[in-house]
Amino acid sequence: MNKINESQLEMDEISKKELHESIIESLLFVSGEPLKLKQISAILECTTKRAQEVLNNMMLKYNDNCRGVKLININDSYQLVTKNENSDYVRKLLKTNTRQALSQAALETLAIIAYKQPITRIDVDEIRGVKSDRAILTLQEKKLIQECGRLDVPGRPILYETTDEFLKNFNLGNIDELPPMEQIASELDEVAVDEEVKEGTE
């Protein structure tokens, strides 16, 4: 193969990668939800290895450039999300966020499940010292936690774990990226103070 043909092949390969990046960007934008790697490769009609290479390259581009969004990978699912440093401005537009939308009880329950998962409601109740039925129902409705089986003991109580939606809302790639428990406790205290201030002005 001569140099001209080699150069043409290289150009074709670059063009194909750029086309795949463009298609993936459109898919993620239209979806608004995380897309599985296998789903993306099926739409592109290419191997998962090829799709992975394109996605990795896209993640580098988004992280290096001064863009308002970034490409994240959560358990082999990809999604375009706003960058953390712009969250205050986005919050002004949305007027609310996940943490503000949750009560103190729900936040406490969510923190316990996040760090102790899988865990039963009874165990959550024992840690909190109060009933958590309503908080757990709220977290399920917001798709932040889900049932993940039953504990093999008499009564077979339901086990709960956090979801990919939880990871997305708290800007985590996986559960191992959870901050220290002390930091979460501090944030919960701030939320409690905010709620007391609101109640005092109503």
UniProtKB/Swiss-Prot annotation:
Subcellular compartments: Cytoplasm
Family of the protein in this entry: Belongs to the ScpB family.
GO cellular component entries: cytoplasm
Name used for this protein in its record: Segregation and condensation protein B
Described purpose of this protein according to its UniProt entry: Participates in chromosomal partition during cell division. May act via the formation of a condensin-like complex containing Smc and ScpA that pull DNA away from mid-cell into both cell halves.
NCBIfam families: SMC-Scp complex subunit ScpB
Lineage, highest ranks first: Bacteria, Bacillati, Bacillota, Clostridia, Eubacteriales
Quaternary data: Homodimer. Homodimerization may be required to stabilize the binding of ScpA to the Smc head domains. Component of a cohesin-like complex composed of ScpA, ScpB and the Smc homodimer, in which ScpA and ScpB bind to the head domain of Smc. The presence of the three proteins is required for the association of the complex with DNA.
Keyword annotations: Cell cycle, Cell division, Chromosome partition, Cytoplasm
Chief localization: cytoplasm
Gene Ontology process terms (BP): cell division; chromosome separation; DNA replication
